[in-house]
Swiss-Prot record:
Glycans are attached at residues 97, 273, 462. This is Low-density lipoprotein receptor. Residues 722-770 are annotated as: Clustered O-linked oligosaccharides. It comes from Mus musculus (Mouse). Residues 315-354, 355-394, 663-713 form the EGF-like domain.
């Protein structure tokens, strides 16, 4: 090979290598190339958090060239950032330079609203009503004495209520004066009472609540009027117990154990338990003393055992030898060395650093978390945008608002308090509510009326209400709406049940009922087919189950006493609940793991009742404080007062389109008949795995699913029929197409069945049931045949199959013999026997051998 050819090959190799390097350095269309050649996602450029090692993705030169879209606002300034237009002048600073809240026109109230001195707007109904609805109290500043109309009753506190509510056995005035004997003129109000009495294991508060009897005289008020702590003996601790500063008792072994067991933390005060020297500038001698770090290796003995003056270590820098054995950073100490790790890494085996997966920790990000080497990245779900100033995910679009119950009404308040009105006035005792955002509809339950209602939100003030459920309700404390499949779910604490119905209230079914259960609040996840509810029975718990009533189990059973409200943050996949006994807000993931206590506060969580999640905030109602509070849902910090001077605020929900994401209604989009082919209810099934059914059929109470898994039969009929036809579960998967195996009871009497007319069922469905009943009756008739006939019906098919197999074998043998070259002998005996054996007769049952004859040699010889 010549020198020129060799040089030419070297040039080609170098060009190919350069092209490969260039190809590796180039980034894809959706990526941004840092100055050092690293590629990052384009959406991370100029988001306020540097991802490039050299910081070039957040440099002023890069970000100043960013052009905002038409529906965005440019923050401008040194580093231009883009935010949604809807965040402009919303009362919250989103730009670093506050430019999104500068030059905003003053907010004006509508002609029908009252403007508070702080600029907020409230409904004129709230002015001079005895409650401070403006945070500055300006709505009650210049009010005259309250006068009630002729159709109203004046409470002792000057509040006006409808006359029909007075002396009805249900306390409506804050002071209870509407039920005082002197105001009722001796009328019997006990017979009119609508509140359910407490059980024998519960204590009836003077304020009408029911609490566990074990909570009476426990040193903590649980009743709203604190009647559970009246006339209690002074508590004294046993000799083996420690008395906390608040008077409560704990076991003596829990004092000074480095854990706070007393609520006031007094069990860890004044403890002397030194196991190491305090502060980084202290050195612990091997002999136990603590000396200043400056005295180490100063050629003077300060430790009794001279451990502060080791001759070899004091003059040696261990980091010079193989970096001290450290994988990243080595820090030389006066005695020895120490391995350190950069930010985003942790030290393992004292020498090696490994990346920390921050995304494994709950609530690292408000929504999505992307783990990177040495760091992590927070992202937002669809419908949200990362706030460049606060680094939290904010909803895009119109501002959200709170809907909450206020005893006799449902109120509506925007999050910036620019609007505060009464949405549903003149209610009796509303306790639970939920919404259907797409249809702009609200649902609520009334504890006194024992009914569930519904109304369009833009028509609600006109008293245009629809009664959804009006029968068989006792205490509907919890309510949730499946906005995808158009169903409602509610709890009833008296029978201890969870039920479901369509949003029209035509079809309903009880999904869960358990003695001793006291279900309270409920929340649904129709995207994945699950429901969750709190239960303050004995023992208290949080339960989870499918929206069709299957796979019900407990998620939380420990460190829980009085769980009230519960809510689900779909974006982060976490459940939040309040505990009125523990005065806390806690959260777990939807599988019951990664539990976290968000906030504990006996003052602002005196008696929390319900809560709602939106963006980075948690909102909750408190019936003792008669107020609504908010806090950071990740840290529990930044607690603020949202509304006060309310009348028994209980349920609260957040109304915004991002709280109810879209999903697929498989009951309407399948290839089956409408309603999934179900005769009655079509309920979503829990999506436990990739092969889980999408929905199941369900029947009303007192009826069971038939063998086709879609139509319904009365439970009475199934008892009269055979065990086989009645052993069908009331809720089954829609993917099942074969009826279950069943046994036959020969001794069961033959009883005719009639088609069942069920409310809400069509004529076609009734015909289906009748046809199936006839089929069952035909099957029943066969059971009465003699045992001999049954034996023949089983034996004959088996014999026929055996004959067919035998004939096939003979045909194969015949074919094989015909294709074999054989030698014929003249021996007549041999010839006769072989001819007989090869002679095959064909009968109507197939090929069979003829009866074999016995031939004697003596006969032939003769």
């Amino acid at each position: 090979m010549s020198t020129a050819d060799l040089m030419r090959r070297w040039v080609i190799a170098l060009l190919l290598a350069a092209a490969g390097v260039a190809a590796e350095d180039s980034c894809s269309r959706n990526e941004f190339q840092c100055r050092d050649g690293k590629c990052i996602a384009s959406k991370w450029v100029c988001d306020g958090s540097p991802e490039c090692p050299d910081g070039s993705d957040e440099s002023p030169e890069t970000c100043m060239s960013v052009t905002c879209q038409s529906n965005q606002f440019s923050c401008g300034g040194r580093v231009s950032r883009c935010i949604p237009d809807s965040w402009r002048c919303d009362g919250q600073v989103d730009c670093e330079n506050d430019s999104d809240e500068q030059g905003c026109p003053p907010k004006t109230c509508s002609q029908d609203d009252f403007r508070c001195q702080d600029g907020k707007c409230i409904s004129p109904q709230f002015v001079c009503d005895g409650d401070r609805d403006c945070l500055d109290g300006s709505d009650e500043a210049h009010c005259q004495a309250t006068t009630c109309g002729p159709a109203h009753f004046r409470c002792n506190s000057s509040i006006c209520i409808p006359s029909l509510w007075a002396c009805d056995g249900d306390v409506d005035c804050v002071d209870g004066s509407d039920e005082w004997p002197q105001n009722c003129q001796g009328r019997d109000t006990a017979s009119k009472g609508v509140s359910s009495p407490c059980s024998s294991l519960e204590f009836h508060c003077g304020s009408s609540e029911c609490i566990h009897r074990s909570w009476v005289c426990d040193g903590e008020a649980d009743c709203k009027d604190k009647s559970d702590e009246e006339h209690c003996a002074v508590a004294t601790c046993r000799p083996d117990e420690f008395q906390c500063a608040d008077g409560s008792c704990i076991h003596g072994s829990r004092q000074c154990d480095r854990e706070h067991d007393c609520k006031d933390m007094s069990d860890e005060l004044g403890c002397v338990n030194v196991t190491q020297c305090d502060g980084p500038n202290k050195f612990k001698c091997h002999s136990g003393e603590c000396i200043s770090l400056d005295k180490v290796c100063d050629s003077a003995r300060d430790c009794q055992d001279w451990s502060d003056e080791p001759i070899k270590e004091c003059k040696t820098n261990e980091c010079l030898d193989n970096n001290g054995g450290c994988s990243h950073i080595c820090k030389d100490l006066k005695i020895g060395s120490e391995c350190l790790c950069p930010s985003g890494f942790r030290l393992v085996d004292l020498h090696r650093c490994e990346d920390i997966d921050e995304c494994q920790e709950p609530d690292t990000c408000s929504q999505l978390c992307v783990n990177l080497e040495g760091s992590y990245k927070c992202e937002c779900q669809a419908g949200f945008h990362m706030d460049p100033h606060t680094r939290v995910c904010k909803a895009v679009g119109s501002i959200g608002y709170l809907l909450f119950t206020n005893r006799h009404e449902v109120r509506k308040m925007t999050l910036d308090r620019s609007e505060y009105t009464s949405l549903l006035p003149n209610l009796k005792n509303v306790v639970a509510l939920d919404t259907e955002v797409t249809n702009n509809r609200i649902y609520w339950s009334d504890l006194s009326q024992k009914k569930i209602y519904s109304a369009l939100m833009d028509q609600a003030p006109n008293l245009s209400y629809d009664t959804i459920i009006s029968e068989d309700l006792h205490a509907p404390d919890g309510l949730a709406v499946d906005w995808i499949h158009r169903n409602i779910y509610w709890t009833d604490s008296v029978p201890g049940s969870v039920s479901v119905a369509d949003t029209k209230g035509v079809k309903r079914r009880t999904l869960f009922q358990e003695a001793g259960s006291r279900p309270r609040a409920i929340v649904v996840d129709p995207v994945h087919g699950f429901m969750y509810w709190t239960d303050w029975g004995t023992p208290a718990k949080i339960k989870k189950g499918g929206l069709n009533g299957v796979d019900i189990h407990s998620l939380v059973t420990e460190n829980i006493q009085w769980p009230n409200g519960i809510t689900l943050d779909l974006s982060s996949g976490r459940l939040y609940w309040v505990d009125s006994k523990l005065h806390s807000i806690s959260s777990i993931d939807v599988n019951g793991g990664n539990r976290k206590t968000i906030l504990e506060d006996e003052n602002r969580l005196a008696h929390p009742f319900s809560l709602a999640i939106y963006e980075d905030k948690v909102y909750w109602t408190d019936v003792i404080n008669e107020a609504i509070f908010s806090a950071n849902r990740l840290t529990g910090s930044d607690v603020n007062l949202v509304a006060e001077n309310l009348l028994s605020p209980e349920d609260i929900v957040l109304f915004h389109k991002v709280t109810q994401p879209r999903g697929v209604n498989w009951c309407e989009t399948t290839a089956l008949l409408p309603n999934g082919g179900c005769q009655y209810l079509c309920l979503p099934a829990p999506q436990i795995g990739p092969h889980s059914p999408k929905f199941t059929c369900a029947c009303p109470d007192g009826m069971l699913l038939a063998k086709d898994m879609r139509s319904c039969l009365t439970e009475v009929d199934t008892v009269l029929t055979t065990q086989g036809t009645s052993a069908v579960r009331p809720v089954v998967t829609a993917s099942a197409t074969r009826p279950p195996k069943h046994s036959e009871d020969l001794s069961a009497p033959s009883t005719p069945r009639q088609p069942v007319d069920t409310p809400g069922l069509s004529t076609v469905a009734s015909v289906t049931v009748s046809h199936q009943v006839q089929g069952d009756m035909a099957g029943r008739g066969n059971e009465e045949q003699p045992h001999g006939m049954r034996f023949l019906s089983i034996f004959f098919p088996i014999a026929l199959v055996a004959l067919l197999v035998l004939g096939a074998v003979l045909l194969w043998r015949n074919w094989r013999l015909k294709n074999i070259n054989s030698i014929n002998f003249d021996n007549p005996v041999y010839q006769k026997t072989t001819e007989d054996e090869l002679h095959i007769c064909r009968s109507q049952d197939g090929y069979t051998y003829p009866s074999r004859q016995m031939v004697s040699l003596e006969d032939d010889v003769a």
